[in-house]
Amino acid sequence: MFDLSRLSRGIVPMALLLLGISACTPSQTSQSIAINGSSTVYPITEAIVADFSGGKKGVDIDVEFSGTGGGFKLFCEGKTDIADASRPINKQEMKLCNDNQVRYVELPIAFDAITVVSNPKNDWLKSLTVEELKRIWEPAAEKTLTRWNQVRPEFPDQPINLYSPGEDSGTFDYFTEAIVGQAGASRLDTLKSEDDEILVQGVVQDLYSLGYFGFAYYEGRIADLKAIGVDNGRGPVLPSRETVEKSEYQPLSRPLFIYVNATKAQDNPALREFVDFYLANASATATKVGYIPLPEEAYNLGKISFNKGEVGTVFGGESVMDLTIGELLKKQASFE
């Protein structure tokens, strides 16, 4: 018997889901898979798609990125099979999915450390406090805090040039909430892009730059970028696998997800096979592309959730700040 309390959390067993699947949009073909969403998650998914496609003929997989918000919109309209996400689904997106009878399985696949970066030729900036980051990025700083010596007097009297993910980005949502205190609250006089490679190029070419994006994009260009330590009151901490696993890199550590359309997974054997392959290879692939893999227990819980058809989210549409890997495991187990 299924637990009625799960309905309040948006979690429904697949057996109940199947009673109402006929109204959902079918997959493009039985052998096609459409993926869209986070540019942060994209390198993991792209690598897994390449590995899966290398040994699987006749499956057409289209993987793109438009930001977490843009990806959820497409997903909840039934236009894609999988949404890559760098934050949990929010209440507005949950409503859109519900309105379109899109049920989903939420699968954590890695941890990220949002990395604050500058140009490596910048020899005076080594760390910033959370309060300094807030002063730099908050809306009130627009056209008022524009030079580095306004952050600290010992910094040079030179312009601050800011590089930020776009407003559809889950990284933008998470950073602004964690640092400024409200998701989406940010000054507008910045260079924004949903493409993290454009942000990387901007920082690389600009001595007085400051930007942020997912850890893998820093790791991939580590010789061309300088990570800035984040001081949350206990001294500066640099992003790394070790500082994330020890819950030291706060508040900019966060989980990464894929969301799978449960109805399409029922109808499309190739999609089911791909998700199984994804979970089996997520740890090694996350490490390879530069993210922090989850403990094996997390992937096992994901396999259970997917195979049992546990649909919904354990986050209730709420933002999650300062989540540790251990706390994520506890949330995953709450599906049981």
Swiss-Prot record:
It holds the Pfam family PBP_like_2. InterPro entries: PBP_domain, Phos-bd, Phosphate_ABC_transporter. The keyword Magnesium does not apply. Residues 1-27 form the signal peptide. CDD domains: PBP2_phosphate_like_2. The keyword Transport applies. GO terms for molecular function: phosphate ion binding. Keywords: Signal, Transport. Belongs to the PstS family. NCBIfam families: ptsS_2. May be involved in the system for phosphate transport across the cytoplasmic membrane. This is Protein SphX. The gene is sphX.
